[in-house]
């Protein structure tokens, strides 16, 4: 992502990333409410993805590359290994070489809105626990159950994900919450609402989703291209760069088993074990 970010800046390109919720009207309304200050001081934020529709990934033998597939191109810089359907379309996301599990798959969408709402870029430290608790013997490598805790110095963000369980926080399979001293704002792709703390503020009933955020996101991108106005992008390349880093931090903390600390000036962690996991290794002629 740093290479893409630097290339976009160097060549003056207009690049929009897929955080389309920034173009969804009810998400915009929720953030406007958050920024009104009615919730009071925010001390904790949560983001979560509970995926009950996802089951185990049974082990299957390696197989010949399907006709019409340029496997070398599909692999790109990833390590070369025999073709296996589990590592191909969709299920590739459960292997470290290609994807990074739910922590990044859903995390880049939901954590982005925590960062956006709270006006933050990176945490001071991260720690994480979890494992393959639901399907310990299947072919997935990434954890099916995980919690990561991010310290932003003046508030804490908690990420949770599970596979095989769908009843998440506030009875939502996915979402975000901003927990303030006066009340809590809960937000997902279906709508948002506010729960008051001891009647300090008025409750806000569910404000339902309207419009199509993905279409509006594409329209925003095209408008910026037509008018050469990169400053009006709802989610420029810097947005993707930032949230990809923060989501990956959760995985790095999980994989090292350490509480990790970030040095933003040096753009690296403070330990070699953590830095090793964000140092790219290119294969198949890529560099």
Residue ranges and their predicted role:
Residues 1-23, 37:
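Beta-strand-loop-alpha-helix segment that lines the small-molecule cofactor/substrate pocket
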Residues 10-11, 36, 227, 256:
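Charged, alpha-helical scaffolding/interaction elements associated with membrane systems
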Residues 15-18, 34, 45-47, 57:
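Alpha/beta-hydrolase
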Residues 7, 29-33:
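Active-site Tyr-X1-5-Lys
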Residues 28-29, 41, 46-100, 104-238, ...:
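Contiguous beta-strand/loop segments that form the cofactor/metal-binding neighborhood of enzyme cores
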């Amino acid at each position: 992502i740093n290479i893409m970010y630097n290339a976009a800046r160097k060549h003056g390109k207009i690049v929009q990333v897929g955080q389309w919720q920034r173009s969804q009207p009810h998400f915009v309304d929720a953030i406007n409410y958050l920024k009104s200050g009615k919730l009071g001081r925010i001390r904790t934020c949560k983001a979560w993805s509970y995926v009950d529709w996802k089951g185990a990934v049974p082990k299957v033998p390696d197989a010949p590359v399907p006709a019409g597939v340029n496997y070398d191109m599909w692999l790109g810089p990833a390590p070369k290994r025999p073709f296996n359907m589990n590592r191909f379309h969709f299920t590739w996301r459960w292997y470290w070489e290609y994807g990074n599990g739910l922590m990044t798959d859903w995390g880049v969408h939901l954590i982005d809105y925590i960062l956006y709402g709270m006006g933050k870029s990176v945490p001071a430290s991260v720690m994480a626990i979890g494992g393959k608790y639901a399907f310990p013997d299947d072919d997935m490598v990434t954890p099916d159950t995980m919690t990561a805790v991010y310290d932003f110095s003046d508030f804490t963000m908690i990420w949770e994900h599970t596979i095989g369980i769908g009843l998440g926080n506030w009875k939502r399979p996915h979402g975000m919450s901003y927990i303030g001293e006066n009340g809590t704002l809960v937000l997902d792709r279906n709508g948002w609402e506010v729960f008051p703390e001891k009647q300090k503020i008025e409750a806000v009933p569910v404000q339902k989703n309207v419009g199509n955020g993905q279409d509006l996101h594409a329209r925003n991108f095209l408008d910026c291209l037509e008018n050469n106005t990169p400053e009006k992008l709802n989610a420029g390349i810097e947005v993707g760069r930032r949230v990809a880093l923060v989501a990956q931090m959760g995985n790095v903390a999980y994989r090292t088993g350490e509480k990790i600390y970030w040095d933003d000036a040096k753009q690296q962690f403070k330990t070699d074990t953590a830095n090793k996991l964000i140092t790219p290794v290119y294969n198949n002629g890529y560099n």
